[in-house]
Amino acid sequence: MNLLETVEQDTMPTHYKQMTQVEMIARVTEIKAQLGENLFIPCHHYQKDEVVPFADAIGDSLQLAQIAAQNKKAKHIVFCGVHFMAETADMLTTSEQIVTLPDMRAGCSMADMADIHQLTNAWPKLQTLFGDTILPVTYINSTAAIKSFVGEHGGTTVTSSNATKIVSWALEQKERIFFLPDQHLGRNTAFELGIPLEHMAIWNPIKNELEYEGNLDDCKVILWKGYCSVHQHFTVKNIENIRKNHPNMRIIVHPECTHEVVSLADDSGSTKKIVTEINNAAPGTEWAVGTEANLVGRIIQENPDKKIVSLNPFMCPCMTMNRIDLPHLLWTLEAIQNGEKRNQIKVDEQTTKFALKALERMLQLS
């Protein structure tokens, strides 16, 4: 999402904020019923509880990408997630389908840490250092422009659900990979595949330089210096506190956490894995969960027979995900009902052409 898109969006009328929860729920329910199969609402796990009940599908990034690619019926897809997810949905759906984002301010700080101009500046420098030995791999939490560059250069997208499989494949294609924008997912995945930390370098996009003290020939993974502002806040101290105060508690974290945190946790995995593992656990088990607060709260509600806490007791929700709320959802649905275009996400054909190559490689491998 760029600044112009944010400025150009319509501002939601204030009367939506003045409506009661009961009124909004009734209106959303009514419009959903009227639109029927012409409307599809995918919803990410990190969304607010007030939005989730209206979802036609709930999932992680991989699940929602797969669902978007399979859905050919709905004319309108109202994406309850963040901007890069809506872009992905637009590229994977038909040209007749319209993807909208209820609030255009719902971006992703991690995705914004990898700018296409920074990437096009980095690539020739890396080619000079390593020659034609690098395959770019981008986390799905990236802009369409980044995905397009990666697709054009033979690379693929990846999610936290399929990271091990995709990165393993990528390392079979070229001698080394360039993983962006999340250094932690890249580091944790590569380490799980047996690559030592000393064989991983950092690419600093601000300085436009490689940060690596070893022999270049030993470098197998180049990590873009980006991170998730939510998962960065889970710390080793959080884990030590759980071990001290709740010795029977099992710790499961998202692989966007730092390597130190992931290494000390009992398990790590995508939001889908976290949800599935806890839901399937025996009654009475105890869990500390290192991921976004909305999801942790929902897991607690859905598992009253278990003791579940956030790994970080002072954790906040993802603030950009939180911009999608019931008033914005209703505002968007009423626009669709009235035949108005609002907050449509449309990726240009040239960008889509190569971004689809990266997305389709991932979906085929998944």
Swiss-Prot record:
- Which GO cellular component terms are attached? cytosol
Q: What is this protein called?
A: Quinolinate synthase
Organism (species): Listeria monocytogenes serovar 1/2a (strain ATCC BAA-679 / EGD-e)
InterPro entries the UniProt entry points to = NadA, NadA_sf, Quinolinate_synth_A_type3
- Record Pfam families: NadA
Describe the function of this protein: Catalyzes the condensation of iminoaspartate with dihydroxyacetone phosphate to form quinolinate.
Please indicate if the UniProt record lists Metal-binding as a keyword: yes
Indicate the enzyme's highest-level EC class.
transferase
Binding annotation for iminosuccinate? H44, S61, Y139, I140, N141, S160, H254, P255, E256, T271
